[in-house]
Amino acid sequence: RAGAIAYVMRSAGTDSHRNPHTGITRFDEGLKPIPSAALSLPDADQLARLVALGPVKVAIDLDCGWNGEYTSQNVIGEITGRSKPDEVVVIGGHLDSWDQGTGAIDDAAGVGITMAAGHLIGQRRDKPLRTIRVIAFANEERGLFGGKAYAAAHANEVAKHQIVSESDFGAGRIYSFNTNAPASAKPAV
């Protein structure tokens, strides 16, 4: 809208390595897409130091494109609860990865952790009280589409979901826990 010919942003990630966490770029309806890129934190810091010294010219060389949309699917496994089968506990990770990653940490580790947890729960002699649903969500990186599709498909059962948890970046130290639970539910979380 203001006439920019390109856009560069500081990485959305928090790691200090040279791989920027690029996220996704969207443009409002009717706006012409422009080249956009994320800089790693060290590179963004260097650019900020240079900008502080005076005007800076940046050349952008991107090798990317749009190949259209594709259909993907959530993968869902379920262990039926023994005494409260209508109450559901969801654990999961997501199947896709961002463009600079191998997918090992984000999020094959999360899928592996939750699949292993589901397997261990399924091996127990005493089955869980509630139904355990293990989900490998599709298309998280482009806008949480797998999670949104699951929510839409189960909208009439939302009150039966006791808790939903996703393991993302599951192979390192746990550095945060986030919840959208209402304040009244936070003591249970």
Regions found by a protein language model. Name each.
Residues 34-46, 51, 84-86, 99, ...:
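Metal-dependent peptidase/peptidase-like ectodomains
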Residues 104-111, 182-186:
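Short, conserved loop/turn and helix-capping segments at secondary-structure boundaries
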